[in-house]
Amino acid sequence: MEKSFDYDVIIIGTGPGGEGAAMNLAKRQKKVAIIERYHQVGGGCTHWGTIPSKALRQSVSRLIEYNSNPLFNQNEQVKQLTFQDILSHASAVIQKQVSLRSGFYNRNRVEHIQGQASFIDAHTISISHPDGSVEKISAKQIMIATGSRPYRPDDIDFDHPRVYDSDSILSLKHAPQHVIIYGAGVIGSEYASIFRGLGVKVDLINTRERLLSFLDTEMSDSLSYHLWNSGVVIRHGEEIERVESSEDAVIVHLKSGKKMRADCLLFANGRTGNTADLNLAAAGLKADGRGQLKVNDCYQTEVDNIFAVGDVIGYPSLASAAFDQGRIAASAMVDSSSKAKLIVDIPTGIYTIPEISSVGKTEQELTEAKIPYEVGRAQFKHLARAQISNNLVGSLKILFHRETKEILGIHCFGENAAEIIHIGQAIMQQTNGGNTIEYFVETTFNYPTMAEAFRVAALNGLNRLF
């Protein structure tokens, strides 16, 4: 006789991965409970990561646009905003997202339970509620979608009011004139753009020799130049030795012997999977040193009935990918396998100012693989739409095979790059000869549009062939 359970599936975490799984399972008529320890749904993506940082960036971008446009700024009186000023917009967006996502669970009859989840065994979860009560629920299958949190080294005092990570920075109570950002990855680079756009002095400490070294070199160089040109001081190849703090300042001592003083420190160097409080051992699981879980192609852990998706399994650690992982894993939970797979070329969007987006191979990767490629480029400053909107900084680069004309990679730098990239991505996904740069020459684009950059870049690249 088959054992009875309270639910078909319990999902731990309401971020993109948990949501994607819950919606798919609900559509398949499964009884689903989703557990969230925070008092609102949405996970780190909605409350501390993707949504608030992009909302902050949007406000700063519009501020920069206003101050740099003579049509609006005829008296040369610079409009100034503080970090607290723009937080109100981010908070409003967060609440809209919470309302929207709460509606998803209600309409699809997914039971939302607030509390801290931990394993009792591979089928049973203990939930500690905010009021101190504890309940136990069980399910045939369980999904871990708990996301990640900022890495906090033990020797840095994050309780100090002038030391922040990428979560706590959203609770900034003062108006810093100078900020040190340690870690020049995606998060650090985005916040460097935000603070500098507000007129705050920024020291960006990079532990590597290049900014965002996974990007195409031209994109990385473009970002470095524009951050430098805006006044951000970038220090490459540096590591923190210790942090000295006072009531209203921090002094960062580097292993190279340098030291810097600022109003506050934003530590943005690495993230850790949220598994420490789950009592994984009771379920027969063990996380690695970064708090992450290993899974197979169907997102199944080494315990057959337990699956994991999103940041808690590591790469690619993108909200977009997490949602798809949840959806794919849900299919595997129901059908024992899933025909759908995460696409190979996942687009990357980095919301610096200007923003960056890419899909496919970089020039470095193609050169190393000895693939005969050609390059097509379009400069935004030559596009009528860019001239109209006064967003002249940026470019689009298409990498394609010289012989087959197959598109191998697309890299974009500039306003709306993360939107523009999807036009190229759609063509790259075509099969049976549909993936060709000639598509952009043969189709008709609306005029004037930023999308026209694809036609310009395609013509530029094809004209290089001989």
Curated annotation (Swiss-Prot):
What does the record list as GO biological process? 2-oxoglutarate metabolic process; NADP metabolic process
What InterPro entries does this protein's entry cite?
Class-I_Pyr_Nuc-Dis_Oxidored, FAD/NAD-bd_sf, FAD/NAD-binding_dom, FAD/NAD-linked_Rdtase_dimer_sf, Pyr_nuc-diS_OxRdtase, Pyr_nucl-diS_OxRdtase_dimer, STH_gammaproteobact
A Pfam family the protein falls into:
Pyr_redox_2
User: Which keywords annotate this record?
Assistant: Cytoplasm, FAD, Flavoprotein, NAD, NADP, Oxidoreductase
EC no. given is 1.6.1.1
What the entry lists under SUPFAM superfamilies is as follows:
FAD/NAD(P)-binding domain, FAD/NAD-linked reductases, dimerisation (C-terminal) domain
Q: Which locations, inside or outside the cell, does it occupy?
A: Cytoplasm
PANTHER family, alphabetized: DISULFIDE OXIDOREDUCTASE, SOLUBLE PYRIDINE NUCLEOTIDE TRANSHYDROGENASE
Please give the name of this protein. Answer: Soluble pyridine nucleotide transhydrogenase
What organism does the UniProt record list as the source?
Answer: Colwellia psychrerythraea (strain 34H / ATCC BAA-681)
